[in-house]
């Protein structure tokens, strides 16, 4: 009985308040799909959804008024590549064999919930967790947040990462056995790949994540196609971690929905991505983050950080569909993961990506890739009321997204600093 009362008290302290009818008076409303701005709009929200948008919308009696008349309002932001349960600030954990040996699933699930509220407060109302999630812990984090037990974004999950033998464990001695199976599924034939997709779906995955080239082995076109066929039959997109080269070609021609990272993609492969409609979730690490992880190595006269910027610039110029994703796995004593995620906007600026294109990558494009475009990614009647606001025009300077002053999640105001 005491435990039940204690749990009730804890949930009462952290749970979202019930939804209410709210009228938001937006000084400027941004439509990322078109890059246009309309002034003096009223957004009416009821039961967690947007019910009306326009300059002359009349709020019903008793509706709560939210004055954002001096702000710029836009759809909630989406990070399509996160690891909310991970902290790889300890360089030993970069080898992805020690994090899940040192920490229990329970500890990492608690970290994920701790991160979730902070991530929402900086403007990300939806994130996709792409594995390394402590044995499906992110699935239960998603359910806890969806049930309103805790405050956080909508979390979409991929479950365990499907890989050729060995996962991303680098080098584990044969005496230790396949330690990586806590977070990866070894799948080395078409049948094993299909079964791995089915396993993830069974345990609650809403998307599929594969690693194509993290070892001496990489997936063939037919193997990628098998995963895509199985996932698409269940309505799930497939995203694949790959650098470039022949492995990337197999990913594109195998029909994957997106490439994650792609730091070594050539112009030829980027052009092929455009032709096939393969999105790039670019995970554009800032150079100081790479240095903290000892990953900013130089090859062919170019550091990885510079290579990332160059690849992003070329992808945009060629017309590849860009989707924003951070892959932020760090925590620092003075800065939390959510705050570090904001540094990625600077990379897009340094690559010369127009703010309108970046906003589209953060909303519309991400929603389409995640197959949630019918409920998220735009501000329109019938859409989920995931809304953020900033103090000035992000189309002029993307960096203002670091200064989110208002967050609404599913019709509930969770942050208002204006």
Model-inferred region functions:
Residues 88-91, 138, 218, 248-254, ...:
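Histidine/acidic-residue-rich catalytic or RNA/ligand-binding cores of hydrolases
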Residues 85-108, 165-182, 274-305, 319-322, ...:
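Active-site gating loops and adjacent loop-to-helix segments of metal-dependent hydrolytic enzymes
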Residues 71, 81-87, 211, 241, ...:
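Histidine-centered divalent metal-coordination motifs
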Residues 72-143, 147-149, 222, 250-254:
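Metal-associated gating/positioning segment near the N- to mid-region
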Residues 368, 381-418:
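C-terminal cap of metal-dependent C-N hydrolases
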